[in-house]
Amino acid sequence: EMTSSLVGSEMCIRDRDYADMSRKAANIISAQVIMKPNCVLGLATGGTPVGAYAQLVDWYNKGDLDFSEVTTVNLDEYRGLPKEHPESYWSFMHKNLFDKVNIRPEAIHLPDGTNPDAADACKKYNEIIHSVGGIDLQLLGLGPNGHIGFNEPGEAFELETHCVDLTQETIEANKRFFDGNVDLVPKQAYTMGIKTIMQARKVLMVVNGTG
C-alpha cells in the first residue's frame, strides 16, 4: 500500500514571466526523463503547462529528449466527451505534446471520459496508476481558486480517482470553448484525487502570476 505522505519533494514555480516559468518547468521535466528514461510523468492540461510542453517539443526536435520509454498519466478528463472531441483533454494533450514527440500510444493514459460507469472508470484508472508503478513526477497547474485538477478547495484528502460535479463557475468559464452554449459543456469530470497526487515521488506545481 502506498502511503499518502509526500514521499518525494514538492517544487513550486511561481513566476509572472510566462516564458521563464515554462522554461523552468520544462527543465525539471526533461531532467526527470534524462535521469530515468522509462519514468512515469503525471501531466496536466490548461494554459499554464502549454509553454512547458512547447519547450519540451523544441528540445525533442533538437535531439535532446527521447520519450520512447516514457509513460504518462493525466490528471483529469471530462466525463461524456468522446476522445476525439476538440475540447477533450485527450485531444489537448495530443495537440500540444503527444503528436509531436516519440511517445508510444499505448504508454499514454487518461481517465476514460467515454465510460458511463463512473465507479468503473475511476477504479480502472487507479489500477492503471498502480500498475505502472506510481508517478515519478506530477505536473500541476494551480487554478484561480486554488483547485488542483477538478479537486476544489476542501476536497477530501483520502480520495483517489473520482468523479466530480463541476462548479457553476467552471461550467461558465468553459462555455467559451463550446460556442457559448452551456448545454454542451460537460458537467462532470474524472479526476485524480489529492491522495493520488500526493503519492507521486515528485510534485511540480506551476503558478503563473497571480492566478
Model-predicted segments: where are they?
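Single conserved hydrophobic/aromatic residue that forms the stacking wall/gate
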Residues: E1-G8, I13
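Ligand-binding beta-strand-loop-alpha-helix segment within the catalytic cores
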Residues: S9, L65-Q138
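A glycine-rich beta-strand to alpha-helix segment
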Residues: C39, G47-A52, E127-E155
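C-terminal functional extensions of proteins
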Residues: Y190-G211
